[in-house]
Amino acid sequence: MKSYFPDILNLLKVSSGDLLEIGSGEGDFLLYAAQNSNFKVQGYDVIEHAGRDPNRKTRVKNKLVNAGLNEQDYIWLSNKDILPFKDGSFNAIVSIQTIEHIKNTERVFSEIQRLLKPGGLALHYFPSAEILIDPHSGVPLAHKFPTKTKEILSFFSLLGFGKYKLYADKHNYSKNEFINEFDNYLSNKCFYRKLNYYINLSEKIGLNSWYSPPPPLQNFSFLTKLVSYFTSIYLFQKKTI
């Protein structure tokens, strides 16, 4: 369980109805929500993001089924697939560390607007373009200068910053393998955008939106911009009609 899972459930303000998670990954939040709320949970991920682990789909399915969820509660789709849910299906929609990986954000936000029930709330926890340290590689500024990503990864890894040692220990990576892996990952699978982009896009498609820092700084919204340089933030979207 991630430390922010309880915060996410608390921030939704409701604990029952239908909940959809976008980008469910290993299914950990689905399990947590199913076991710690009265939500009927569903999740999906895209097959293109399943990664290099060929057993991931089977492993996640077995984990969810063994915990009492239905196999149909977690589906895999292609990037080009339309979400197979009816209009107004969900009281709550959640994404965790997913938004920065979505290339066509307008399409996904439009689907959120379609899928939320009136009064429903979407909550996204993710790093914006303001963040100074790329959370995937752990390397400062690695995502800030697309034409210099390799050089930045190499420089900071040489100084001991980032996750190179973790990957060396866990996957037996050489430094060049680590650099090439994250150069490709940041170039092709990460699409960092600034906070105001998400706010403006949400409003454009008819969702009231705001953002805030993580608890316990929730009551200090004036710190959100500052906090966004150092950690992920929460983006809220509410469907009013």
Annotate each language-model stretch with its function:
Residues 28, 32-81:
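Class I SAM-dependent methyltransferase SAM/SAH-binding core
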Residues 102-103, 116-118:
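Helix-to-beta-strand junctions that scaffold the AdoMet/dcAdoMet cofactor pocket
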Residues 1-16:
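Conserved alpha-helix/loop element of class I SAM-dependent methyltransferases that forms part
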Residues 91-103:
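A short SAM/SAH-binding and catalytic strip from SAM-dependent methyltransferases
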Residues 81-92:
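A short acidic, Gly/Pro-enriched loop at the edge of an enzyme's catalytic core
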Residues 16-25:
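Conserved class I S-adenosyl-L-methionine
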Residues 106-108, 121-241:
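S-adenosyl-L-methionine-dependent methyltransferase catalytic module, highlighting the catalytic core
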Residues 31-34, 109-113:
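A structural alpha-helix within SAM-dependent methyltransferase catalytic domains
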